[in-house]
């Protein structure tokens, strides 16, 4: 049985909470267990939480969910790029799968709501990687 850590960004929680629920359901459907869930203010804050979870002996993989919507500037692109880079670094540094279930950048809130299934995708990818790399 795969043990997961789940990181959930609260910013845009009307999107991220359903994403987290989709991740929880996917884990249950795949007979995986979420041993810990960490809530962070936004996607940009997720690498530290993912790192803390990836350090744990009882966590086989970490799934991260969040939503980055567009604004009046390119801020969403900066946040998405930095977050993806740091989450990849956590995965490599800890030798633990960390999956990127963060929708965006460059999308509206409505488009983000259409991508709630990214939460399930992140959990399923984490489970698959943990199984494959075990």
UniProtKB/Swiss-Prot annotation:
| Protein's name in the database | 6,7-dimethyl-8-ribityllumazine synthase
Q: Where does (2S)-2-hydroxy-3-oxobutyl phosphate bind?
A: 72-73, 115
Q: Which InterPro entries match?
A: LS, LS/RS, LS/RS_sf
Q: Which UniProt keywords apply?
A: Riboflavin biosynthesis, Transferase
Q: Which SUPFAM superfamilies match?
A: Lumazine synthase (SSF52121)
What are the cysteine partners in each disulfide bond?
A: none
Q: Which HAMAP family match?
A: Lumazine_synth
Q: Which source organism?
A: Halorubrum lacusprofundi (strain ATCC 49239 / DSM 5036 / JCM 8891 / ACAM 34)
Q: Which PANTHER family match?
A: 6,7-DIMETHYL-8-RIBITYLLUMAZINE SYNTHASE, 6,7-DIMETHYL-8-RIBITYLLUMAZINE SYNTHASE DMRL SYNTHASE LUMAZINE SYNTHASE
Record-listed E.C. numbers: 2.5.1.78
Residue positions annotated to bind 5-amino-6-(D-ribitylamino)uracil are: 11, 43-45, 67-69, 100
Catalysed transformations (reactions): (2S)-2-hydroxy-3-oxobutyl phosphate + 5-amino-6-(D-ribitylamino)uracil = 6,7-dimethyl-8-(1-D-ribityl)lumazine + phosphate + 2 H2O + H(+)
Q: Name one GO cellular component term.
A: riboflavin synthase complex
């Amino acid at each position: 049985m795969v043990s997961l850590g789940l990181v959930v960004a609260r910013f845009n929680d009307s999107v991220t909470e359903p994403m987290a629920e989709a991740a929880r359901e996917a884990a249950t459907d795949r007979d995986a267990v979420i041993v810990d869930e960490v809530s962070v203010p936004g996607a940009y804050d997720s690498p530290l939480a993912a790192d803390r979870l990836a350090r744990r002996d009882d966590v086989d993989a970490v799934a991260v969910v969040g939503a980055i919507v567009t604004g009046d500037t390119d801020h969403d692109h900066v946040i998405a790029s930095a977050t993806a880079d740091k989450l990849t670094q956590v995965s490599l540094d800890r030798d633990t799968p960390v999956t990127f279930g963060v929708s965006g950048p460059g999308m509206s809130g409505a488009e983000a709501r259409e991508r709630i299934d990214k939460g399930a995708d992140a959990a399923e990818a984490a489970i698959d990687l943990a199984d494959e790399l075990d």
